[in-house]
Swiss-Prot record:
CDD domains: IgV_pIgR_like (cd05716). The chain crosses the membrane at residues 646-668. Residues 19-645 are extracellular. The modification Phosphoserine is found at residues 680, 689, 696, 742. GO terms for molecular function: polymeric immunoglobulin binding; polymeric immunoglobulin receptor activity. Interacts (mainly via CDR1-like domain) with dimeric IgA. Interacts (mainly via CDR2-like domain) with pentameric IgM. GO terms for cellular component: plasma membrane; receptor complex; secretory IgA immunoglobulin complex. PROSITE patterns: IG_LIKE. This is Polymeric immunoglobulin receptor. Glycans are attached at residues 90, 147, 170, 206, 420, 471. The gene is Pigr.
Length: 771
């Protein structure tokens, strides 16, 4: 094989550059007559994809003379042997140069712009002479750590003779191995001489785990003396050419490592070059650099030694030279196969800057915004939790078409927002076990993978959103309402209720959108957003969320589980929202029932304003019956007559008292109607009724007008001066009680009067018995 077909290509890439987003190889080496391909990367923007690309040579004066450009320009010295190709889909352009000469050695720039002073990257090209080798020399080119098999032919007459391989050093040839199993100490365990099958005209020497020291000239020989068969071999051992990786800040990168079947069973690793050493950042034995905690995975691909390492949430300091390898220790070892990369992190990232750490409290919630490529709005979105055990893995917890994992039932949902480049993941009912690292993923552009660290602290106060009770039961076929209380800071935000399922959380319609089976209403004055199920069906059972959001940005949420059951006979279901009202009614009924006459054991149902008159009539009729029975009686009836007279003398005054009470109630009702009619007068500015006066104190001056949550409006010279207090203050405990109108006060006075009258009657009745 002719020598010029083999090229020594050593590429060394520069460190992180923050001055220019253009990236390429810093040094390129080759030999005369060979060719090189130089790849330069540029940021992913429409302008960069369509602007001029160029390759120029720097002179002693600092000027850079264009040799070739994407506009079609080609200099004379490159005519017929160079071209420039733009790959906009990869955001790269490649300069190919053939028939290299030593005159091509020099300093160059690859760049973008209408002039050569635009964005650029410096490249040094060195072209060396072809090494002088014997004409019959066979050249083998291998990478460090790989194996080489040298083929040594011979004549049949030398078949019984000794075979050997030696390495030339100065004027001598040092033995490597021979057919008598003699091996140089430097090659023990690495060199092997053998023949294949029945072919007696060729022997082979295999050398494994090649190092730089193995490079040089070798001679393989069969036989001795002038009749011996000899062959010259030139072994070139090169460091693997680094692969360029151009990634945006906050994006992800994957290192695909293929080391060969011979190391399939060895431990694998990825390390980063640090001057003369390579520091392991992860290996399959469980070692992991703390700087990459929560954002790195190592994954075996197959049984042929292939594996990959994924790093998400790239930072500026992640740029550098990386190397993957395999060894039983999980650490870099000389003579073992490796692959190398040069990673460039572009700070002009298209991925939006999001919080890398989200904080929550136990019992609370978090809403995490995950970015994705806006051009791939139809892509599937996922959210997974990073686990560091073993080689690390990230099981999917929820996705746009993936059901929520069972352990996250009722507290995890993904909200897809097509078109704006963001989807939101909400996790509520937080516990300390939820703390950890989570990844945002799509099935589209793999660069758009981001990492979020969730920190959960113990709650020190009540949550902002409160739904009580936490476990509610609704009755089938009835109306059920549950309310969610929110603080003042959420006043301007949109409030919503949604029904959770393992495919998401469906937002329920509000009353403004029309009456439906499930609807939501919001009372801003009481800071309550209520959800009503009307009528309740079995399908309504499950988890519901109350939450707030600002436009497309989701905020806090809280969850409640609503059970649905059928009504059983003799049971009555009390809606939590009506509990206080029903308790008040029960109290009033208890006051009225206390007026039952113990003697007659008859209750007065639905006592009205004239109930006392009916009771007086009943008492009068009963007195007349007692007198009639006294006149028709015998001597024994005369004793009863005396008792009847005592009872009559007692009940007559009682009847008079009841009559006076009835008159008092009638007067109070008449006055109430007059007051209402009098205060119903309205002007074009103000409507006033008795219900507007909370109590007698409201008729006086207000000591704290600034604390009023209502808008105060004053007309000055035909202009409206509106003063609105946005501060939300809590009313005193007394003011939170239900305010009574004049009618309610009269009813309460009447009920108390009946109770007192019943007590007096009982005392009078017991008096004669004791006598």
């Amino acid at each position: 094989m002719r020598l010029y077909l083999f090229t020594l290509l050593v590429t060394v890439f520069s460190g992180v550059s923050t001055k220019s987003p253009i990236f390429g190889p810093q040094e390129v080496s080759s030999i005369e007559g060979d060719s090189v391909s130089i790849t330069c990367y540029y940021p992913d923007t429409s302008v960069n994809r369509h602007t001029r690309k160029y390759w120029c040579r720097q002179g002693a004066s600092g000027m850079c003379t264009t040799l070739i450009s994407s506009n079609g320009y080609l200099s004379k010295e490159y005519s017929g042997r160079a071209n420039l190709i733009n790959f906009p889909e990869n955001n790269t352009f490649v300069i190919n140069i053939e028939q290299l000469t030593q005159d091509d050695t020099g300093s160059y720039k690859c760049g973008l712009g209408t002039s050569n002073r635009g964005l650029s990257f410096d490249v040094s090209l060195e072209v060396s002479q072809v090494p002088e080798l014997p004409s019959d020399t066979h050249v083998y080119t291998k990478d460090i750590g790989r194996n080489v098999t040298i083929e040594c032919p011979f004549k049949r007459e030398n078949a019984p003779s000794k075979k050997s391989l030696c390495k030339k050093t100065n004027q001598s040839c040092e033995l490597v191995i021979d057919s008598t199993e003699k091996v140089n100490p430097s090659y023990i365990g690495r060199a092997k001489l053998f023949m294949k099958g029945t072919d007696l005209t060729v022997f082979y020497v295999n050398i494994s785990h090649l190092t730089h020291n193995d490079a040089g000239l070798y001679i393989c020989q069969a036989g001795e003396g002038p009749s011996a068969d000899k062959k010259n071999v030139d072994l070139q051992v090169l460091a693997p050419e680094p692969e360029l990786l151009y990634k945006d800040l906050r994006s992800s990168v994957t290192f695909e490592c293929d080391l060969g079947r011979e190391v399939a069973n060895e431990a694998k690793y990825l390390c980063r070059m640090n001057k003369e050493t390579c520091d392991v950042i992860i290996n399959t034995l469980g070692k992991r650099d703390p700087d990459f905690e929560g954002r790195i995975l190592i994954t075996p691909k197959d049984d042929n030694g292939r594996f990959s390492v994924l790093i998400t949430g790239l930072r500026k300091e992640d740029a550098g030279h990386y190397q993957c390898g395999a060894h039983s220790s999980g650490l870099p070892q000389e003579g073992w196969p490796i692959q190398t990369w040069q990673l460039f992190v572009n700070e002009e990232s298209t991925i939006p800057n999001r919080r890398s750490v989200v904080k929550g409290v136990t019992g609370g919630s978090v809403a995490i915004a995950c970015p994705y490529n806006p051009k791939e709005s139809s892509s599937l979105k996922y959210w997974c939790r990073w686990e560091g055990d073993g080689n690390g893995h990230c099981p999917v917890l929820v996705g746009t078409q993936a059901q929520v994992q069972e352990e996250y039932e009722g507290r995890l949902a993904l909200f897809d927002q097509p078109g704006n480049g963001t989807y939101t993941v909400i996790l509520n009912q937080l516990t300390t076990e939820d703390a950890g690292f989570y990844w945002c993923l799509t099935n589209g552009d793999s660069r758009w993978r981001t990492t979020i660290e969730l920190q959960v602290a113990e709650a020190t106060r009540e949550p902002n959103l409160e739904v009580t009770p936490q476990n509610a039961t609704a009755v089938l076929g009835e109306t059920f309402t549950v309310s969610c209380h929110y603080p003042c800071k959420f006043y301007s935000q949109e409030k919503y209720w949604c029904k959770w399922s393992n495919k998401g959380c469906h937002i329920l319609p509000s009353h403004d959108e029309g009456a439906r089976q499930s609807s939501v209403s919001c009372d801003q004055s009481s800071q309550l957003v209520s959800m009503t199920l009307n009528p309740v069906s079995k399908e309504d059972e499950g988890w519901y969320w109350c939450g707030v959001k600002q436009g497309q940005t989701y905020g806090e949420t809280t969850a409640i589980y609503i059970a649905v059951e059928e009504r059983t006979r003799g049971s009555s279901h009390v809606n939590p929202t009506d509990a206080n009202a029903r308790a008040k009614v029960a109290l009033e009924e208890e006051v009225v029932d206390s007026s039952i006459s113990e003697k007659e054991n008859k209750a007065i149902p639905n006592p009205g304003p004239f109930a006392n008159e009916r009771e007086i009539q009943n008492v009068g009729d009963q007195a007349q019956e007692n007198r009639a029975s006294g006149d028709a009686g015998s001597a024994d009836g005369q004793s009863r007559s005396s008792s009847s007279k005592v009872l009559f003398s007692t009940l007559v005054p009682l009847g008079l008292v009841l009559a006076v009470g009835a008159i008092a109630v009638w007067v109070a009702r008449v006055r109430h109607r007059k007051n209402v009619d009098r205060m119903s007068i309205s002007s074009y500015r103000t409507d006033i009724s008795m219900a507007d006066f909370k109590n007698s104190r409201d008729l006086g001056g207000n000591d704290n007008m600034g604390a009023s949550p209502d808008t105060q409006q004053t007309v000055i010279e035909g202009k409206d001066e509106i003063v609105t207090t946005t501060e939300c203050t809590a009313e005193p405990e007394e003011s939170k009680k239900a305010k009574r109108s004049s009618k309610e006060e009269a009813d309460m006075a009447y009920s108390a009067f009946l109770l007192q009258s019943s007590t007096i009657a009982a005392q009078v009745h017991d008096g004669p018995q004791e006598a």
